Amino acid sequence: RRSSDLVLGAGSLTQLVTHKDEHIESPRELKGKTVTVLAYTDTTYYALLGMLSKVGLTKDDVNIQAAGPAGVWQQFASKKAVGMAGVPDWTVSSMDAGAQVDILPADVYFKSMAQAILASDDTIEKNPQLIQKLVRATLKGMKDIMADPKAATKVYVEHVPAHKGKEASILKAFEMYNQYVYAAQKVPGQMDEVRLAELQKFYVTNGVVPKEVPVKDLYTNKFVMGK
C-alpha cells in the first residue's frame, strides 16, 4: 500500500488552457474539438474527463489526443488543438512559443488534486525521519515560491544552471502555480479528505480504479503537522 504524505496546494494541478481567439468560456464548448493531454493514463486526462462530466459531455464528445510531454503543448501552440489540459509549465511553454491563451481552472468544474508526495506504508513505518525531511524540504520550497517567486526563481537558477537565461519563463510558471495550484491551502501540505473522497468516487465510477477503499488509508497528515 501507498500513502500520500502531503498535497502541494489547495487547487488542481491541471487547468484547461485554450486559445484566446477561440473564446471558449466553458468545457461545453469543446464538443467536436481537439484537446491535448499528456497521456490516457495521466491526471491531465482524468481531470479533463471530470470537467467534461460536469457539463454533460464524455470522452466521445471531444477529440482527446494523448500527445506526450512535449507534444501536449506543442500541438496546442501550433493550433493543431483548440485546447490542452495542462500544468503551468506547459502553459508557459506554449506562451513562449507565441500562443495567446485563456486559462480555466479545473476547480471551477472538477476538483482534481495538486501534486503530492507518495511513500509506501513500509517506508513510513521504518524510516519516518526520511519522510519528515523530504516533506519539510518540499514545503519550504513551496512556501518560498509563494512568498517571493522572484527570489525563488533566482535561487532555482543558481542550483539548476542549465536554466540560466530562462528566468522570465520560470518566474511566470511559479506565479501560475501560486495563482492556480498553491493558493488558499489553510495548512500548507495538508490533505483535504472530503476532496480526496469525492475524487475517489469519480475514479471508481469511471473505471480508473476498481473499487473504493477507506479514504483514511490513502493519506497521512502527520508529517505535515510535524508529529
Outline where the language-model segments fall:
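Pocket-lining segment of extracytoplasmic ligand-binding domains
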Residues: 22, 71-162
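Secondary-structure end/capping motifs
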Residues: 126-208
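Mature soluble domains of exported/periplasmic/lumenal proteins and thiol-rich metal-chelating peptides
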Residues: 52-56, 61, 150, 164-168, ...
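Short coil/loop linkers at secondary-structure junctions
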Residues: 53, 58, 100, 162-163, ...
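Short secondary-structure boundary/capping segments
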Residues: 6-8, 27, 107-109
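Conserved C-terminal helix/tail region of periplasmic/extracytoplasmic solute-binding proteins
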Residues: 196-227
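Bilobed "Venus flytrap"/periplasmic-binding protein-like clamshell domains
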Residues: 12-96, 114, 194-197
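Short, small-residue-biased leader/transition segments that mark boundaries at the very start
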Residues: 1-3
